[in-house]
A protein has these predicted regions:
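Conserved, well-structured core domains of diverse proteins
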Residues: 1-133, 140-144
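Long, contiguous bundles of hydrophobic transmembrane helices that form the permeation core
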Residues: 2, 7-48, 55, 329-431, ...
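Membrane-interfacial loop-to-helix junctions in multi-pass transporters
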Residues: 137-141, 200-213, 239-253, 284-290, ...
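Hydrophobic transmembrane alpha-helices that form the pore/transport pathway of multi-pass ion
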Residues: 234-302, 308, 312-315, 321, ...
Length: 660
């Protein structure tokens, strides 16, 4: 995995050219920990036929979002019809239940029936809208079947936990409707109408955002990956941090942050980037449990890394009614603190173990990296287009896709061929299935909450429970987000939390932006929080470590993700909200950085040298003090951490003098 000094191209080809057995092992890991990878196997002409359908879907999404401005219900129902069609083509009835070039008769029926239900709505949207609650019996049957087929597809590609949430809410909604009208048919009719035929259900805000923005950016990410930018990111990270103590771990942090931003998948990025970085970390001297944890924590953070954040960020922009560029800017400081926290932890671990960095022979030359800097052009163009606000997000994404294709053709080491273009469009469609289905189910969940008025009930209950103790409200919200996020995709988790918990925080007095960022962050960290820490378990499998210990280490490394949301909740200036002065923002960030350093040192048991339990507790306490708003708490925290630092500095000096 090292770069030859006589051939710097090797540094950019780190992840390419994997032998067939290694690639097979990685694919097996993906299937084990990433539900999206448990797909049917198509070979021969069938593989190309299915791929062609996927390509048509991607091209349809690009074309329709750019040029179609008709009835929203029509385009969203047609979008879900295609999602159902390619979804059943892709996902078998259960994990491992796959035969090559085989699709059972019942899957064909489900695919055709489900697609027909959504197409019926798409072609008859206007008359159905005019009928409103006066829909006929056949409308109810079609809508009910469409919902059931969508639920089955969700079970296959998203998972059961989100369906448990939906099931509980559907039962509650049914009884709620019966309280108004004792007729079972009328209750069912009302539920089907609101959840299938209105924008308070499957074609609600989540699916609208998915169709309008998310799918385009998934396709953009697929093209960007095929330009060779991931290899460039790893090589760049090697050049920037490989030389320092424990360099490979820092390389993992930087490269995973950059690659995770493009891939948008915690597990997927852990497996792909980790196949390079984890062996490097182990070779340097890091314990397997720690190496897997570093990769998992850094890959998970890719979803909060501007400018291309996770799919939930687009939903957040829609829910807050803010431009995506504004959301990305507000995410900068929390993301910096998150990755700085991981960086500090791996540095302290390296110092504690006495690890060295990579040699010059193992790092690429700056001259070669500069030759490949054009690979960043699509990202730079996207940032410029989005931040300028001159064009729509759809236009920005489409132009950036075109730029990625051009850049791919220019990269002679990993040139973008027509086959790769086909594969990128195919991968974009596959990536859209899970997100689209999750958004549709999240729309139904949000619809149930809206129809029943459950949000108001929950808001009043938690506000009364927490009273004036806003901190308790934050803790309750955090627990809800993490527990739900353990089995629910980030997009669906955010939609549910934005409909329930975010309004609670807003009613308690927290700013709108802070409330939504709070639930967004804690929905993401579930991927590294035991017992269901899928990204950590994937990292553990590559490192051949203990899954639970890897998960615990990943949680420790990502401690900033558990603390930073509380900081910006009480000090929203970190999100550029209610900013009184530039100095106020600088002060918040500096105290947060020192606080993260203190907590990381306490958890690692090392600052300038190994420390005992008392010093570790003092560091953690001091770090938390620095994160609590207020000059007094900052002063106390600074004194505590500074005291430990001074004592260890003197101890090191004495030890050096005694040796001399």
């Amino acid at each position: 995995m090292s770069a030859n000094k006589n051939d710097p191209k090797d540094a950019v080809k780190m992840t390419s050219g994997l032998d067939s057995q290694t690639q097979a092992d990685l694919d097996a890991l993906m299937r084990k920990y990433d539900r999206e990878s448990n797909t049917r196997v198509w070979e021969g002409w069938q593989r190309w036929a299915v791929g062609a359908i996927m390509v048509i879907f991607s091209l349809y999404c690009i074309g329709m979002t750019l040029f179609y401005s008709g009835l929203p219900e029509t385009r969203l129902a047609a979008f879900l019809a295609m999602i159902v069609f390619i979804g059943f083509l892709t996902y078998p009835v259960k994990k491992g239940h796959v035969k090559v070039n085989s699709m059972p008769w019942y899957d064909i029926i489900l695919m055709l029936v489900g697609t027909s239900c959504f197409l019926y709505f798409a072609f008859n949207a206007l008359p159905i809208i005019k009928l409103a609650t006066r829909i006929q019996t056949h409308h109810v049957i079609i809508g009910a079947i469409g919902i059931l087929v969508l639920i089955e597809l969700c079970r296959r590609c998203v998972g059961v936990p989100i369906l448990c949430v939906l099931g509980a809410l559907l039962i509650y909604t049914f009884y709620n409707q019966l309280s108004y009208n004792p007729s079972l048919y009328q209750a069912l009719k009302n539920i089907v109408y609101k959840l299938f035929y209105t924008t308070n259900g499957v074609i609600g805000t989540p699916v609208n955002v998915c169709y309008t923005y998310i799918v385009l950016f998934i396709i953009f990410g697929a093209f960007l990956e095929r330009t060779g930018i991931a290899n460039f990111f790893i090589a760049l990270a090697n050049r920037l941090a490989g030389w320092s103590a424990g360099g490979p771990a820092k390389v993992a942090v930087i490269s995973s942050a950059l690659c995770g931003m493009v891939s948008g998948s915690s597990v997927g990025n852990t497996v792909t980037t980790g196949s390079v970085t984890i062996p490097m970390m182990k070779k340097t001297g890091y314990h397997p449990d720690f190496a897997g944890a570093v990769e998992a924590a850094a890959s998970t953070g890719g979803q909060i890394m501007p400018p291309i954040m996770g799919a939930a960020a687009f939903l957040m922009a829609e829910y807050m009614d803010l431009p995506y560029a504004t959301v990305a800017v507000k995410a900068i400081l929390p993301a910096v603190l998150y990755f700085t926290g991981i960086f500090i932890s791996v540095h302290l671990e390296a110092k504690k173990l006495g690890l060295k960095g990579l040699s010059k022979d193992e790092m690429p030359k700056w001259s070669f990296l500069l030759q490949k800097i054009y690979l960043l052009a699509p990202l730079v163009l996207l940032v410029w287009l989005v931040s300028s606000g001159a064009k729509t997000m759809q236009f920005s994404a489409a132009v950036s896709i075109l730029a990625a294709i051009i850049v791919g053709f220019l990269n002679k080491d990993e040139r973008l061929t027509f086959k790769k273009i086909f594969e990128a469009l195919e991968a974009g469609a596959k990536g859209a299935i899970t997100v689209g289905v999750a958004c549709a189910i999240a729309g139904m969940i949000a619809g149930c909450i809206t129809v029943t008025g459950l949000a108001s009930i929950l808001i009043n209950a938690i506000v009364q429970l927490a009273g004036s103790a806003t901190f308790i409200g934050l803790i309750l919200t955090m627990v809800c987000c993490i527990v739900l996020g353990m089995g629910v995709p980030t997009t669906a988790n955010y939609c549910i939390m934005a409909s329930t918990c975010a309004p609670i925080l807003i009613k308690m007095g927290f700013p709108l932006v802070a409330a939504h960022f709070f639930v967004f962050y804690f929905g993401i960290v579930a991927d590294i929080t035991p017992p269901v820490a899928l990204a950590a378990y994937a990292g553990s499998a590559i490192a051949k470590g203990n899954p639970m210990k890897t998960g615990i280490n990943a949680t420790k490394l990502a401690i900033a993700a558990f603390i930073v949301p509380y900081i910006f909740a009480y000090s929203p200036a970190m999100l550029f909200v209610n900013v009184t002065s530039v100095w106020a923002v600088i002060q918040i960030v500096l105290s947060a950085l020192l606080g993260i350093f203190g907590v990381a040192a306490g958890l690692e048991g090392f600052m300038l040298r190994k420390m005992n339990l008392l010093f570790r507790l003092i560091c953690i306490g001091g770090g938390l003090g620095l994160m609590i708003p207020g000059a007094l708490s900052d002063l106390v925290g600074l004194v505590l951490i500074g005291g430990v630092f001074a004592i260890q500095y003197v101890q090191n000096k004495k030890e050096t003098l005694s040796k001399d």
